[in-house]
A protein has these predicted regions:
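Conserved ABC ATPase signature
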Residues: 374-382
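Q-loop/switch helix immediately C-terminal to the Walker
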Residues: 341-357
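Conserved ABC ATPase "signature" region
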Residues: 156, 356-370
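Helix N-cap at the start of a conserved alpha-helix in ABC-type nucleotide-binding domains
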Residues: 410-412
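Helix-to-loop junction immediately C-terminal to a conserved catalytic motif
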Residues: 314
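Catalytic Walker B motif of ABC-type/P-loop ATPase nucleotide-binding domains
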Residues: 399-403
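Transmembrane alpha-helices
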Residues: 126, 130, 163-196, 229
Length: 435
């Protein structure tokens, strides 16, 4: 069936191309002036003659090298500046007028200015760079700003290695923005690059061939070299997008969390902890010691500060007053905070660094056929259990579990309670639960 669909798609595309070739042929016959317009056949003949010319491939390689270099420089520098702007607001503010200027100023103006400054040697490279830079920068920065803050918090709490964050959180979020930037900038780089060559006329360039065709009133030559530009642009785009797709979809083996120099802490100690949001006092003079191996269940109404306390213990928020002593934590957030496009096994292995261990742990609370499904295909209760296993299997001194039984039926809850008791392993455990 799939083969048949592909055949139909190819046939449909071929018919569309044939339709426009017929229109092109009819237009050439109606105009009937080879100085103004030539037919597809005349264009093909000229193209064959050009290909047979010994300088054809030098010309193609010369233009491809210039345009490719400009595109590559724009891509790399655009990505780097977007990351820097996301890190520091001042850089974003400083670069904002520059990027707007690059996007707004006509290419022809840049061409004239750069011709005056540098001549024609690096003109095409510079123009491609100036066209690609703002597109890549803007799209990448927008993608970085769209990162899921909850997933970033999760990665911080579990001390997820940078490599895991890069390939499982950052790049998947950036993927649609980068694809969009690449598709737009690839086409524009060829248009602007060849236009710059037409004006600068560097040796062994398609722009030079187009210019000479114009000078000698060789309309067939103009059409033939235009076809070459279109073909090169399509091939260039296919190659770059294919490489980008492979790079952005690659998922390396999960690394173990980075080792911490933080000394092992016995239990939890809170001394005169105060926390408020505006005029709302959430925690007031809270003093408590929770020993290693001890389990504390917080049964308070909603809004009483249970989640706030857990976030304080996890280091995600700071108390207004008082001190908190707490070791490394494994945190089951109020939300599941699973990476939706990968499996439950991968989600746990990203934290433990051991896929076999993650698989065995998940089998205690999930059916075997569910642990390899993408988390976006799991039910709410299944996601909750997967998130719980991630917290419990993490290398930590303290377990913080916010509503661990939310969305679970009686049978699933019984499995989870048994698993939690078996895997506590002398760690302090704080459970937040509604009354």
């Amino acid at each position: 069936m799939e083969h048949k669909m592909n055949y139909k798609k190819i046939l449909r595309g071929g018919l569309i191309v044939a339709f426009w070739l017929v229109i092109w042929t009819l237009a050439a016959r109606i105009i009937d002036n080879k100085l103004l317009f030539v037919s597809p056949l005349e264009t093909l003949k000229k193209l064959v003659v050009s290909v047979c010319d010994g300088n054809f491939w030098k010309t193609v390689l010369g233009s491809t090298a210039r345009i490719g270099a400009g595109f590559l420089f724009g891509l790399i520098i655009g990505l780097a500046l977007a990351v820097a702007s996301a890190k520091l607001k001042l850089i974003e503010e400083l670069l904002s007028p520059v990027m707007k200027l690059c996007a707004a100023v006509p290419v022809a103006s840049f061409v004239v200015i750069l011709l005056i400054w540098w001549g024609s040697r690096f003109l095409a490279v510079s123009i491609c760079f100036l066209v690609v830079l703002p597109i890549v920068y803007t799209n990448t920065l927008e993608g970085i700003k769209s990162f899921d803050k909850e997933l970033l918090e999760m990665a911080t709490v579990f001390r997820m290695p940078l490599k895991n964050r890069l390939f499982y959180i950052y790049l998947p979020s950036l993927r649609p923005f980068l694809y969009s930037a690449l598709k737009v900038s690839l086409g524009l780089s060829w248009k602007s690059g060849v236009a710059a060559e037409v004006i600068g006329i560097p040796d062994y360039s398609i722009g030079e061939k187009l210019y000479l065709s114009k000078v000698y009133l060789d309309t067939a030559g103009v059409f033939a070299w235009t076809v070459v530009v279109i073909l090169l642009s399509v091939i260039f785009e296919k190659i770059i997008l294919c490489l980008a797709q492979r790079a952005l979809q690659w998922q390396p083996i999960c690394k173990k969390p980075a080792s911490t120099k933080q000394p092992k802490t016995e239990g939890i100690q809170l001394a005169n902890v105060n926390k408020s949001y505006g005029d709302n006092n959430v925690l007031t003079d809270l003093t408590r010691t929770i020993a290693s191996g001890e389990t504390v269940i917080l049964r308070e109404p909603s809004g009483s500060g249970k989640t706030t306390l857990l976030r304080l213990l996890a280091g995600l928020e700071k108390p207004d007053q008082g001190t908190i002593t707490c070791g490394r934590v494994g945190y089951l957030f109020q939300e599941d905070r699973l990476i939706a496009h990968i499996s439950a096994v991968k989600n746990v292995a990203l934290v433990t660094g051991d896929e076999a261990k993650a698989r065995e742990a998940l089998k205690q609370v999930l059916d075997a056929e569910d642990i390899d499904k993408p988390c976006e295909q799991l039910s709410g209760g299944m996601k909750r259990r997967a998130a719980l296993v991630r917290a419990v299997e993490s290398d930590c001194d303290v377990l913080l579990l916010d509503e661990p039984f939310n969305g679970l039926d009686d049978e699933s809850r019984e499995k989870v309670e048994k698993y939690m008791k078996e895997r506590q392993n002398g760690r302090s455990m704080v459970i937040a639960s509604h009354i």
